[in-house]
């Protein structure tokens, strides 16, 4: 019986809940406009801070009716305004509420409302639009669908401090990427918003500042314009510097520092400018201190990482400012150990930000250690740092894993660290694990780091080889992603450098000649260059050259011919001629050149090329072919003389280029010996 009773009970509870809300909706349909207005006002009071009531009213169909009243010409301005206020309140509930409002096409209705002459109604519409556009479920594109909207919003900026605050907030949330920046810039965003930085309202100043930070991000055009904008006789960068002084609210300091950082990275402010070195950088380091809130520390560290990323001098200055390297170690101490039950809220907060803190610290360490050996050593010597980074490689959060890999990659540029810390912590093990199964963005950085670990002086090279790296890297060369193809082939190139014959044979077997030749015709120049580099490293030391050419000679000569005939740049042709020079150094392999008249004619052609690099590379081929201490040298010399090579050598021995001149003289001596 209990089962039978259960449903009616649930239904009665539901009907009770909806009944208490239904009368609010019913009153919206009253024929008396005064009663409708009072109904909307009562609804407004009922939903404030009550998410359950908001959800009920949405389910009962309040939104379409409110939108209808908002758009009716016969509705009084007061009624329209109250409708906009209620809709704004509903939007402040859950994300599902916002989705429901979007489904009812609330944005076009509110944008239409902005054409009203009544300021209070306009402000209510803007406040509601602000709430909807700042929700993560709202597509930013909805602001740009109608081309008349942005210019109209620009015109409304002068109406009141509320229109200024809401419109700037809408712009800063909906400006995502260069297309949006261009639209706002072309409609006069810089000129219309600049003077708001001196508004008496803190909220207006703050929202205007946020607008400039999103407009300037990675945008040279906007940044170059901002540098020269005057507001009340003061240049914008000077205003931003004033806003990042210690006596200003933290939010303002951080956002001003972002504006100056983005302008600097976009090339509008020099990295050695005082406003960067003496103001922006110290402000961002301050934001990383223990005194700041966790979210401020995250934002401070990430912005600082971005500011110093390309500049070694800023990296050095940051590394010795306020013990920054040691200060960042504290980012890994969250969540803190909780003793009292009263700290549960604190624990929840710490947990929420722990991932972000670790990610920010890794990013900043990566930027700090990008170039300077001493800074890298300081980072690695910081308490348990290598352990923390290695742990970061297996974090559940993709963003933390990516930041940890980037940090390791930055530190792996150090020969000293590759030989010591990286070996002590067997970094290659977790790295190989990361490479087995990770999103492309992580794979790109991890495989790039593997290239460093496979350099000939790295002690990690041997164990990496033994753990199946060849197959893994050959797999990467088949990726759709050009960056992964480059890194895969680059790592194989490093692996093949001065390697034993067995390793070279493993590479050729795993890669397959078909794939090797696919890579030699890759549209990506970097892939082609690294593949040629791999081939050059495979074809080094005579026994290896002869062995490889005895099995793959025909295909390799074919590939070389195609590249020398193709429309390739100087570097590609030079690398290809160097491969030929290596083949010419083989004992039996050189016969593959001597019996190929087409290749010999190409070498002759490049000896007379206008570019010295190509002449030199062709000369290496000739020197190796005519060297008289080797068997068959007389026949080779005779054949090359008949082709006119000796005449070219005489001509080159008079070359103004000392290298070329010396090489030609050395080759001629082989004929005289």
UniProtKB/Swiss-Prot annotation:
Keywords from the UniProt entry: Acetylation, Cytoplasm, Nucleus, Phosphoprotein, Repeat
GO CC terms: cytoplasm; GID complex; nucleus; ubiquitin ligase complex
InterPro entries, per database record: ARM-like (IPR011989), ARM-type_fold (IPR016024), Armadillo (IPR000225), ARMC8/Vid28 (IPR038739)
PROSITE patterns: ARM_REPEAT
ARM repeats: from-to residues: 51-92, 95-134, 138-176, 178-217, 224-265, 269-309, 313-352, 374-413, 416-455, 458-497, 501-540, 543-585, 588-627, 634-673
Record's keyword annotation contains Zinc: no
One Pfam family it belongs to: Arm
Phosphoserine modifications at: 337, 512
Modified residues (N-acetylalanine): 2
Subcellular location: Nucleus; Cytoplasm
Swiss-Prot/TrEMBL GO biological process terms: proteasome-mediated ubiquitin-dependent protein catabolic process
Signal peptide residues on this chain, from the entry's feature table: none
Role summary: Component of the CTLH E3 ubiquitin-protein ligase complex that selectively accepts ubiquitin from UBE2H and mediates ubiquitination and subsequent proteasomal degradation of the transcription factor HBP1.
Subunit relationships: Identified in the CTLH complex that contains GID4, RANBP9 and/or RANBP10, MKLN1, MAEA, RMND5A (or alternatively its paralog RMND5B), GID8, ARMC8, WDR26 and YPEL5. Within this complex, MAEA, RMND5A (or alternatively its paralog RMND5B), GID8, WDR26, and RANBP9 and/or RANBP10 form the catalytic core, while GID4, MKLN1, ARMC8 and YPEL5 have ancillary roles.
Name listed for the protein in its UniProt record: Armadillo repeat-containing protein 8
Naturally occurring in which organism (per UniProt): Bos taurus (Bovine)
């Amino acid at each position: 019986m209990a089962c039978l009773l259960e449903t009616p009970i649930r239904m009665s509870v539901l009907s009770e809940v909806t009944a208490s809300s239904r009368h609010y909706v019913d009153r919206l349909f009253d024929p008396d406009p005064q009663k409708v207005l009072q109904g909307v006002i009562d609804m407004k009071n009922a939903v404030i801070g009550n998410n359950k009531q908001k959800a009920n009213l949405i389910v009962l169909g309040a939104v379409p009716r409110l939108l209808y009243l908002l758009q009716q010409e016969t509705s009084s301005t007061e009624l329209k305004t109250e409708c906009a206020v209620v809709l704004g309140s509903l939007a402040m509930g859950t994300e599902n509420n916002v989705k429901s409002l979007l489904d009812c096409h609330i944005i076009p209705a509110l944008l239409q409302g902005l054409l009203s002459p009544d300021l209070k109604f306009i402000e209510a519409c803007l406040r509601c639009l602000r709430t909807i556009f700042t929700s993560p479920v709202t597509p930013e594109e909805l602001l740009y669908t109608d081309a008349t909207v942005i210019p109209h919003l620009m015109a409304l900026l002068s109406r009141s401090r509320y229109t200024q605050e809401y419109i700037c907030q809408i712009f800063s949330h909906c400006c995502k990427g260069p297309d949006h920046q261009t639209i706002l810039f072309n409609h006069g965003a810089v000129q219309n918003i600049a003077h708001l930085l001196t508004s008496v309202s803190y909220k207006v100043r703050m929202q205007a500042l946020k607008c400039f930070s999103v407009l300037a991000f990675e945008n040279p055009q906007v940044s170059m314009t901002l540098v020269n904008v005057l507001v009340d006789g003061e240049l914008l960068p000077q205003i931003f510097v004033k806003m990042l002084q210690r006596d200003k609210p933290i939010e303002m300091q951080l956002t001003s520092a972002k504006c100056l950082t983005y302008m600097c990275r976009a090339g509008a402010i020099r990295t050695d400018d005082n406003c960067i070195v003496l103001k922006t950088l110290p402000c961002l380091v301050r934001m990383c201190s223990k005194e700041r809130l966790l979210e401020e520390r995250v934002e401070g560290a990430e912005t600082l990482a971005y500011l110093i990323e390309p500049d070694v001098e800023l990296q050095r200055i940051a590394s010795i400012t306020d013990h920054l390297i040691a200060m960042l170690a504290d980012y890994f101490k969250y969540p803190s150990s909780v003793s009292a039950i009263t700290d549960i809220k604190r624990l929840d907060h710490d947990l929420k930000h722990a991932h972000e803190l670790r990610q920010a610290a890794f990013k900043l360490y990566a930027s700090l250690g990008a170039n300077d050996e001493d800074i890298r050593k300081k980072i690695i010597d910081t308490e348990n740092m290598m352990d923390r980074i290695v742990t970061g490689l297996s974090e559940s959060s993709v963003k933390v894993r990516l930041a940890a890999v980037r940090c390791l990659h930055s530190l792996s540029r150090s020969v000293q660290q590759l030989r010591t810390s990286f070996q002590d912590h067997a970094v290659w093990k977790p790295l190989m694990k990361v490479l087995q199964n990770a999103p492309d963005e992580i794979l790109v950085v991890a495989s790039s780091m593997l290239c460093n670990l496979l350099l000939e002086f790295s002690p990690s090279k041997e164990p990496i080889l033994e753990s199946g790296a060849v197959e893994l890297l050959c797999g990467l060369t088949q990726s759709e992603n050009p960056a992964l193809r480059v890194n895969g082939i680059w790592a194989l190139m490093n692996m093949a450098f001065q390697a034993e014959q067995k390793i070279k044979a493993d590479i050729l077997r795993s890669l397959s000649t078909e794939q090797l030749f696919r890579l030699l015709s890759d549209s990506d120049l970097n892939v082609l260059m690294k593949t040629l580099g791999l081939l050059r490293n495979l074809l080094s030391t005579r026994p290896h050259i002869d062995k490889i050419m005895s099995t793959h000679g025909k295909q390799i000569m074919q590939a070389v011919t195609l590249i020398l005939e193709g429309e390739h740049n100087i570097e590609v042709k030079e690398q290809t001629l160097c491969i030929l020079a290596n083949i010419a150094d083989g004992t039996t392999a050189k016969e593959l050149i001597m019996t190929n008249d087409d290749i010999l004619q190409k070498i002759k052609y490049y000896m007379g090329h206008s570019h010295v690099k190509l002449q030199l590379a062709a000369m290496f081929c000739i020197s190796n072919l005519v060297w008289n201490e080797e068997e068959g040298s007389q026949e080779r010399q005779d054949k090359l003389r008949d082709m006119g090579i000796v005449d070219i050598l005489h001509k080159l021995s008079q070359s103004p280029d000392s290298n070329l001149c010396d090489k030609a003289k050395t080759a001629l001596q082989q004929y005289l010996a």
